[in-house]
Amino acid sequence: MLLEKKYKGYSLFAYDNFFIEIGKNIIDKEYKELNIFKNTKRNYVSEIQINNISYIFKEPRNECIIPQRKFFTLFKKGEALTTLINVNQAISEDNLTEYAKPFLAIVKRKNGMICYSAFIQEKINIETDRNLDKMIEITKKIHSKGYYHGDRNPSNFITSKDEIKILDTQAKKMGFGNYRAHYDILTMKMDSYQDMRYPYKKNIFYYLALSVKKFKKLKFIEKIKEKKKKLREKGWKI
């Protein structure tokens, strides 16, 4: 059962009271930061240690700084809590143990909108061999259970001889058709695995996903995205 605890203006969510207490440690800054993997306007990701146990800590910042996304958090759980709930359900109900397990979500709201969120998940101690074919197979497995990744690039997968782990996903369910499945696979094929043998039948959803991918790669669209990125780095909230 999902637990919720209020603490110093924050809402802590976990499936075990142990991680509620870990959340209090994080809010009180009672942890050691071992490595910072990413620190941008969009995300903060680091390895932290509490009571000699290491975790991956992530702050998804986009929903707090981009006005339209922040507004819609009035009606949504937010990325941290969604990740906690969805991934744990996928692991327990569909036996998708390849997902890196999240333990805790921290959410703070102001005027009903999220102004801060974070979550922690297990630290994966595997040296990846970056096996692209294994990544395709595990992606097909989550698609067969009705889930999609949403950011299907090799850095979000850890592969080894005996184990595969999936990172950085909210484990959302696909809607009507398999558009999201095609989009996941096309992302990898176009960006990092051009020689891939395409694993799905090319139906109407394939061509829709392909059209969207090609549109996003148009030069003027990429220039707009790059301009927005630079403005965000300067503090613009767009």
Region spans (language model):
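Juxta-kinase regulatory segment immediately upstream of eukaryotic protein kinase catalytic domains
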Residues: M1-N35, K227-K237
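ATP-binding glycine-rich loop module of kinase domains
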Residues: E33-F37, K41-T83
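Active-site ExK catalytic segment of metal-dependent nucleases
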Residues: I56-E63, E122-I124, D168-Q170
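Conserved structural core of kinase catalytic domains
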Residues: K76-L81, I91, T97-M135
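Protein kinase catalytic-loop region centered on the HRD/HxD motif
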Residues: K141-Y147
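Catalytic-loop of the protein kinase fold
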Residues: Y147-P154
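C-lobe/activation-segment region of protein kinase-like
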Residues: Y148, E163-I238
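Hydrophobic residue at the +6 position relative to the catalytic HRD Asp in the kinase catalytic loop
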Residues: S155-T159
